[in-house]
Amino acid sequence: MTEFKENFCMAPWTHMSVWQTGDAYPCCIYHWDMPVDNINRSGLKGAWNSEKMRELRLRMLSNEPSEGCAKCTNYDKQGIISYRHKFNTEYDHHYDLVKTTQEDGTVEQMNLAYFDIRFSNLCNMKCRSCGPHFSSKWSEDLIGKPEIVQINHQDMWEEIEEVLPTIEEVYFTGGESLFMPQHYRLLDMLIERGLKPRLTYNSNATRLSLKGKHIKDYWQHFDHIFYCVSLDQVGKKAEYTRAGQTWDTVF
């Protein structure tokens, strides 16, 4: 295993976290108000080598702390296993790509070994711990109707297709990913090419199909699936906490 300095993380060379607003981050716990770019404006390729992403890579190579990485820095100080530790442990086999980093921080090869994409805020529930940013249902209380926020870059699917062979793990969340047609489209693309990355989900487990497409028919094409169910309570308490949930229908 490669030995890394304390402020170095493999994430900017192996990962991108894209939110439903189009905001792009080097990872999902990078400071939420410090996106490196927005793919609705710049696309995946533009975000991969945006000015802020290039600056972040150079800071890490110089072992300089970055404000956006404060959560991992705090975890490390407390002896808690951080995302930084996760990336450096699980993706150190991509270190040769780090060596290709140019003087301005550019990395020519877009490598999304771990791809975290949140296509939209489309959701069938209105959890008390959530809000309109992550649930279209919450917008009903604010503007009287659901407001769907979604990635809308015109070249998104072409760019995703180009990077598919580099993906080792896809993380789906939302909104509710199993409620989104884009989620099934991405799985179709992977299946058509015979690609089998790990699939990781954060789901409310209330529905496993969409318009006749059942998730079990998709999952049988993949070898590793991690399905994390978001539950706070059970029974009536669960229905109270997660408005729209019927406990008897939870998978």
What do the PLM-derived regions correspond to, one by one?
Residues 112-122, 131-152, 165-180, 193-211, ...:
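Core AdoMet radical
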Residues 156-163, 213-219:
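Short amphipathic alpha-helix with an adjacent loop that forms part of the alpha/beta core around
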